[in-house]
Amino acid sequence: MTKFIFVTGGVVSSLGKGITAASLGRLLKDRGLKVTIQKFDPYLNVDPGTMSPYQHGEVFVTDDGAETDLDLGHYERFIDINLNKYSNVTAGKVYSHVLKKERRGDYLGGTVQVIPHITNEIKERLLLAGESTNADVVITEIGGTTGDIESLPFIEAIRQIRSDLGRENVMYVHCTLLPYIKAAGEMKTKPTQHSVKELRGLGIQPDLIVVRTEYEMTQDLKDKIALFCDINKESVIECRDASSLYEIPLQLSAQDMDDIVIKRLDLDAKYETQLDEWQYLLDTVNSLDGTITIGLVGKYVSLQDAYLSVVESLKHAGYPLKKDVVVKWIDSGEVNDNNVEDYLKDVDGILVPGGFGFRASEGKIAAIKYARENNVPYFGICLGMQLATVEFARNVLGLEGAHSAELNPSTPYPIIDLLPEQKDIEDLGGTLRLGLYPCKIKENTLAHQIYDAVNIEERHRHRYEFNNEFREQLEANGMVFSGTSPDGRLVEMVEIPENDFYIACQFHPEFLSRPNRPQPIFKSFVEAAYKHQNK
């Protein structure tokens, strides 16, 4: 029987519910349990795919092509699992599906209501997360804060699921804040008490309370929270502010959180707590010596969460070198051919990540040109690959006005264009090439050296492709098409052997990097940047 753990939050947002859920997932996985994890988002968008990065941050893509919340990236990296489309459920997706059923007549003319129709749809998606993965445990984070109007159907659904499945199969974890009042010189439990009171008013009694705090809690404070919130003293878990996110699983384990959960749900743990690998990772992070600077040239740099997985992947790649990879954030809207050297002269490597739209594209092209001409290690992702071919066409082939048809529909040289089957599609949502696709790598190339394989799979999120009408011209002038779809039709990777390190890919390798297992291209790129630094 699959067990379900629900993680809610109170008092304020940004308490770290996602990191708490991911850390618990890691602890349970290390005890030999099969874990999956899920995020409920109360917003009415069907998914974040068409939301502005300034609103939402990064869109994280799963193997099966779901466009999801960036928290799923934390989940995958912490627990080291690959999630699926059932791991991110939005209110928009739930309501949309219920309304489609109503239009089809599935409800036989009945009145469609939040209870039971919306709550039943939510519960169905809860169960699908477990069924689709055959998990021992499903951990579900409820977005928002207890008492938010938009979260109420989700709270009601997880209340009902306890009766549906039995108390022994369901557990509630509530994250709260323990603020420190400087004038009084003490921490206050009242916000936690009121948050739990609000949750209990909605029919949920938490089994565990995870308290976010700046300072170490006294036993008296824990006892007080336990008394007023009606839980066991050992079920009050302190989560202190940490210099590294990787400390959190160790903090929770030190307070036996995994043991409490295993006992409460009667789980069959195969191993005792074993966090040696995680401790080694944390020791590595805390002993980094020296830095490697990567210039990230993008249009959304004012909200760094827009590139969260890219930055995490760069950090992962620095760990084997015992180096801290520092990102220099460069707004491509500010860059041009005249000032590009001012922005990039002190970086060890240049990365142009994915993106959409014409704005600030010329600044990215200027950065790519600088990298190519000055032999600075270059790594392009998605749009960063597309613009690499555009820059090469303009400045090596001399095709003046060459561009992507997405960014300039009237370009005389559409180096990047839509596939014929995409040209009649008008909707933006869910119409990209999404998810895990195979790539065939050409032997005796940098790509082959990096992966040490001919056949790989990586995650994608794009609509436009390299236009094969220009492939021969670019190849004749020194660009190598080192990765393609298995049928050779779609370009997946390009490189310039003349440079020390110049590679770009159509896919998004950042979605498969792990703290203890850096993604191969990122690892090679950071190594090349380190060599460049020491030239």
Swiss-Prot record:
It is an enzyme of class 6 (ligase). Allosterically activated by GTP, when glutamine is the substrate; GTP has no effect on the reaction when ammonia is the substrate. The allosteric effector GTP functions by stabilizing the protein conformation that binds the tetrahedral intermediate(s) formed during glutamine hydrolysis. Inhibited by the product CTP, via allosteric rather than competitive inhibition. Keywords: ATP-binding, Glutamine amidotransferase, Ligase, Magnesium, Metal-binding, Nucleotide-binding, Pyrimidine biosynthesis. The keyword Cytoplasm does not apply. InterPro entries: Class_I_gatase-like (IPR029062), CTP_synthase (IPR004468), CTP_synthase_N (IPR017456), GATASE (IPR017926), GATase1_CTP_Synthase (IPR033828), P-loop_NTPase (IPR027417). SUPFAM superfamilies: Class I glutamine amidotransferase-like (SSF52317), P-loop containing nucleoside triphosphate hydrolases (SSF52540). Its EC number is 6.3.4.2. L-glutamine binds at residues 54, 355, 383-386, 406, 463. Mg(2+) binds at residues 71, 141. UTP binds at residues 13, 188-193, 224. The active site is at residues 382, 508, 510. Pfam families: CTP_synth_N (PF06418), GATase (PF00117). Residues 1-267 are annotated as: Amidoligase domain. CTP binds at residues 13, 148-150, 188-193, 224. It catalyses: UTP + L-glutamine + ATP + H2O = CTP + L-glutamate + ADP + phosphate + 2 H(+); L-glutamine + H2O = L-glutamate + NH4(+); UTP + NH4(+) + ATP = CTP + ADP + phosphate + 2 H(+). Catalyzes the ATP-dependent amination of UTP to CTP with either L-glutamine or ammonia as the source of nitrogen. Regulates intracellular CTP levels through interactions with the four ribonucleotide triphosphates. Homotetramer. CTPSs have evolved a hybrid strategy for distinguishing between UTP and CTP. The overlapping regions of the product feedback inhibitory and substrate sites recognize a common feature in both compounds, the triphosphate moiety. To differentiate isosteric substrate and product pyrimidine rings, an additional pocket far from the expected kinase/ligase catalytic site, specifically recognizes the cytosine and ribose portions of the product inhibitor. PANTHER family: CTP SYNTHASE, CTP SYNTHASE-RELATED. This is CTP synthase. The lineage of its organism: Bacteria, Bacillati, Bacillota, Bacilli, Bacillales. The gene is pyrG.
